């Protein structure tokens, strides 16, 4: 009887020990998995997804050339996240458009990685906005008008004067930037940014092995205000064919891009007052790169010459704060650097915010284009935008 009791007790003890061991192993496995999960989240953050859509209606009132149309201006999808907490990545794609022309096709517009450990010295590499002008890096909805100013479009890489494909102000390269001289409130007084780029726009390798150097610096004397300048030294190149009199030649040709901008801005939650003057020295190709065959056309646009400039002054002011805003813009561009080529657009309109993510922008434009036989005409635009 005693032997049976002893054996039963021993069996019970062994069973308890085995259960305890299994529990310990299970707890250790759970702790190990938890450590793995924590470790993974420390390395790569959960991606954040966002985007925006812009649709518009445009009517042009021009003698014998009236037109009106609905269109989808932009649909952009964005993914951002952190790696090792100090690196931020960004991927942005444009999903609307066609597949036949470079400037209107679905494409990757941003793909970059930026080291953000020190606000005084940040490093970005990949495809991203050129550091040139205040308006270029702005979200198109935040600009407050149906498009960037003419001079920004032509001299900051949107529909660039050189004939470069439409690149939304972007290029491939590396950039350093930083904010310096913090005041007693912690607001920095000086910002700098400078980068080295291919000079070919988005999704293109370098041609001609000459890089563009672009940079800017500004001071912020009071909150919301910045005053600064930008410079751009580089070129745009093509490899293909051109005619020199009666002789057809082949090889690589380039046009220079020597540009500077003088910029000033005041901005808060409702107010925007911004003005920029931009000057260009450097020629242009005869064709704009919309297709692969255009990239092989190396004929120069002799008529356009090698000088251009422009200026704009824009104001967006609150009528009802956070809800209703009035706006106006003076927008001058001289594609050949002369008044005979000048195109001036006077804009005025109203923007209404249904909420922070939904906005309707309306404007009327009076255009004076001296390159046309009949200089004057007008346009009306309604733009509807959604952020998500």
Task: Label the predicted regions.
Residues 16, 21-24, 107, 209, ...:
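Intrinsic disorder/low-complexity signature
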Residues 1-54:
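N-terminal periplasmic/intermembrane-space "pro-region" immediately following the signal or transit peptide
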Residues 4-6, 37-38, 78, 278, ...:
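Residue-level detector of intrinsically disordered/flexible regions characterized by low predicted structural confidence
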Residues 36-199, 207-214, 218-227, 312-318, ...:
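Outer membrane beta-barrel
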Residues 15-16, 88, 288:
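Hydrophobic alpha-helical membrane context
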Residues 23-27, 61-65, 84, 103, ...:
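Outer-membrane beta-barrel pore domains
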């Amino acid at each position: 009887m005693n032997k049976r009791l002893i054996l039963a007790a021993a069996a019970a003890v062994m069973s308890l020990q085995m259960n305890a061991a299994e529990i310990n192993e299970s707890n250790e496995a759970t702790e190990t998995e938890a450590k793995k999960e924590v470790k993974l989240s420390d390395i790569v953050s959960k991606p954040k997804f966002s985007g925006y859509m812009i649709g518009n209606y445009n009517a042009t009132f021009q003698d014998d050339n009236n037109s009106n149309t609905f269109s989808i201006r932009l649909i952009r999808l964005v993914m951002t996240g952190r790696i090792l907490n100090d690196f931020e990545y960004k991927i942005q794609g444009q999903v609307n458009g066609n597949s036949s022309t470079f400037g209107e096709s679905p494409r990757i517009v941003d793909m970059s990685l930026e080291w953000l450990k020190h606000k005084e010295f940040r490093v970005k590499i990949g495809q991203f906005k050129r550091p040139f002008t205040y308006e270029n890096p702005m979200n198109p909805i935040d600009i407050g008008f149906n498009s960037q100013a003419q001079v920004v479009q032509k001299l900051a890489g949107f529909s660039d004067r050189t004939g470069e494909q439409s690149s939304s102000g972007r290029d491939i390269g590396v950039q350093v930037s930083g904010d310096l001289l913090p005041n007693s409130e912690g607001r920095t007084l000086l910002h700098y940014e400078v980068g080295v780029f291919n000079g070919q726009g988005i999704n293109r390798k370098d041609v001609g092995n000459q890089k563009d150097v672009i940079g800017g610096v500004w001071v912020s004397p009071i909150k919301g205000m910045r005053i600064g300048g930008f410079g751009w030294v580089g070129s745009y190149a093509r490899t293909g064919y051109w005619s020199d009199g009666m002789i057809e030649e082949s090889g690589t040709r380039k046009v220079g891009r020597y540009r500077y901008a003088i910029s000033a801005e005041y901005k808060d939650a409702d107010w925007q007052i911004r003005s920029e003057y931009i000057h260009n020295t450097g020629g242009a190709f005869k064709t704009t790169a919309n297709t692969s065959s255009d990239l092989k056309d190396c004929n120069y646009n002799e008529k356009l010459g090698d000088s251009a400039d422009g200026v704009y002054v824009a104001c967006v002011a609150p009528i009802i704060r956070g809800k209703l805003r009035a706006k106006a813009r003076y927008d001058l561009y001289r594609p050949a650097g002369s008044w005979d080529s000048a195109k001036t657009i006077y804009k005025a309109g109203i923007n209404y915010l249904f909420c922070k993510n939904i906005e309707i922008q309306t404007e009327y434009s009076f255009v004076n284009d001296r390159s046309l036989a009949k200089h004057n005409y007008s346009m009306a635009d309604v733009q509807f935008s959604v952020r998500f």
